[in-house]
Amino acid sequence: MPEKINIADDSSTAGEKLRQWLSRPLGQSLQSEEQNRISNILPKLFGYHVLQIGDFGELDLLESSRISHKIRMLFNPCEDTDSGCTLLGDEESLAIASHSMDVVVLPHVLEFVSNPHKLLREVERILIGEGHLVLTGFNPWSLWGLWRLLLLWREMPPWNGHFYAYTR
């Protein structure tokens, strides 16, 4: 089984390779489409606190949210102080109070963390009872997912992430 990009691993250049892919036309097109979709969802969600865990490119996915308290949590130290990073965290133990977030956004994070089930349990812990989870990910049964399998591009970002089916 190919190795996943571990965005929480500072010792590798996996995160940098993923950012390079996102700067290419196909990556930019994907980011733009996801920004549009998320921009249609977030304004409909109300609350006091919205949290984006991880980043997937240069776009501000939270800009369309009406929620005023916006937090980005990264698993790697911020290299750029102007990046908007407000919180560093660990994927297996989020430093956020239980039942404190109204909305959590996970842009392709589950595909690249070492323990996605643990992260989902942590997200469930921090969400309020009627909170919302907004997730993005690659569909393994889409054309891109099948292309990945046929060409065995599993060693190159973003294709070396673990793609989860919608039914899962």
Predicted feature locations:
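Conserved class I S-adenosyl-L-methionine
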Residues: H132-F163
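Class I SAM-dependent methyltransferase SAM/SAH-binding core
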Residues: N36, N40-L94
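Class I SAM-dependent methyltransferase Rossmann-like catalytic core
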Residues: M1-K44
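A short glycine-rich, Lys/Arg-flanked "PGG" loop and its adjoining helix->strand segment in the class I
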Residues: H117-H132
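A short acidic, Gly/Pro-enriched loop at the edge of an enzyme's catalytic core
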Residues: E92-V104
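A short SAM/SAH-binding and catalytic strip from SAM-dependent methyltransferases
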Residues: D102-H117
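Short "lid" loop at the C-terminus of a central beta-strand within the Rossmann-like core
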Residues: E16, Q20, F56-E58, F138-L143, ...
